[in-house]
């Protein structure tokens, strides 16, 4: 089992194999970002603000290539707020104006009030450039792994350790 560590070539090959897996995952993520024109083409719902449409832990697929159509009222979008690094998933409830200069107001389906309190200080509406993408699909509860890893940091260490052991103990 540990004899494979004694051969430096085999250990280097296993290390390169692990690097190949990581770089392939990174390239797939970046490719998906280019195709969808979204810096974050896949996001996880972190709260219950969009219930019953989406549950906590749902994995959302985003699309940001609205070349012909505009962002419309009723559309579920993911947006970033200046100064905060967690994207928010909510529905557009009002739209003022047309084209790239339109102002958008959002609200969670399960929230009592609109999102003006969530926006950056001095910001009353979202601009089109604040939108990360529109939701085009979802996979229920698949994102719960991400939530578990962020809520239990020790779980990251355990998973990385298991992945490392699999790579080291892998037989060819």
From Swiss-Prot:
Residues 1-14 are cytoplasmic. InterPro entries: LexA/Signal_pep-like_sf, Pept_S26A_signal_pept_1_Ser-AS, Peptidase_S26, Peptidase_S26B. It catalyses: Cleavage of hydrophobic, N-terminal signal or leader sequences from secreted and periplasmic proteins. The keyword Lipid biosynthesis does not apply. The active site is at residues 49, 90, 115. The keyword Protease applies. It comes from the Eukaryota. Gene3D superfamilies: Umud Fragment, subunit A (2.10.109.10). One of its GO terms (molecular function) is serine-type endopeptidase activity. Its EC number is 3.4.21.89. Residues 36-172 are lumenal. One of its GO terms (cellular component) is signal peptidase complex. GO terms for biological process: protein targeting to ER; signal peptide processing. The chain crosses the membrane at residues 15-35. It is an enzyme of class 3 (hydrolase). It is a single-pass type II membrane protein. Residues 158-169 are annotated as: C-terminal short (CTS) helix. Component of the signal peptidase complex (SPC) composed of a catalytic subunit SEC11 and three accessory subunits SPC1, SPC2 and SPC3. The complex induces a local thinning of the ER membrane which is used to measure the length of the signal peptide (SP) h-region of protein substrates. This ensures the selectivity of the complex towards h-regions shorter than 18-20 amino acids. SPC associates with the translocon complex. Catalytic component of the signal peptidase complex (SPC) which catalyzes the cleavage of N-terminal signal sequences from nascent proteins as they are translocated into the lumen of the endoplasmic reticulum. Specifically cleaves N-terminal signal peptides that contain a hydrophobic alpha-helix (h-region) shorter than 18-20 amino acids. The C-terminal short (CTS) helix is essential for catalytic activity. It may be accommodated as a transmembrane helix in the thinned membrane environment of the complex, similarly to the signal peptide in the complex substrates. This is Signal peptidase complex catalytic subunit SEC11. It comes from Chaetomium globosum (strain ATCC 6205 / CBS 148.51 / DSM 1962 / NBRC 6347 / NRRL 1970) (Soil fungus).
